[in-house]
Amino acid sequence: MGSKALFYFGNAAVDQVRNTGWFVGQFVPAEQDLRHQTDVELKWGVHKDGEQRSHPWANGNATTISVLIQGALHVTFDVGGTPQVVTLRTEGDYVIFGPGAVHSWEAVGDTIVLSVRFPSVEVERPRMSSGG
């Protein structure tokens, strides 16, 4: 029987699962030890200028915190049928939203966002599209 690792050193962009940006969570194979988690998931989102999720979507199971590392990000929430836009424009700006928050987003300039989602529950995520 093997022993569980005490630590892991890696790179978020390299360690992402299925080219999604997500690198910690229940979707990481269990043999990856510490990166396989059911309480939290992490995403290193690298987005080109104009890249977007144009179709509003909600994760019905988890709370999400997205922290801007570089660039800018428009996040649009559907609040009772009315769009409400939040713009992350300064490094360290963040938005937190709960389960069921319908949202879409668009990168303004080349953008990097670290997203933390909890708990880590498998859901079908929409594909992103390039702006044009």
Question: Where in the sequence are the language-model features?
Answer:
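Double-stranded beta-helix
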Residues: S3, F7, S104-G132
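A generic fold-level signal
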Residues: Q37-D39, G60, V108
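A short, N-terminal "cap"/entry segment at the start of jelly-roll beta-barrel domains
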Residues: M1-D49, S54-H55, V86-T87, G132
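Short, conserved beta-strand element in jelly-roll/cupin
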Residues: N59-V75
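Short beta-strand His + acidic residue motifs that chelate non-heme Fe in jelly-roll/DSBH
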Residues: S54-P56, V75-T76, F97, V102-V108, ...
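Tight coil/turn sites that cap or link beta-strands
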Residues: K48-Q52, E91-G92, G98-G100, D110
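Short acidic-glycine-tyrosine-enriched beta hairpin
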Residues: V79-P99
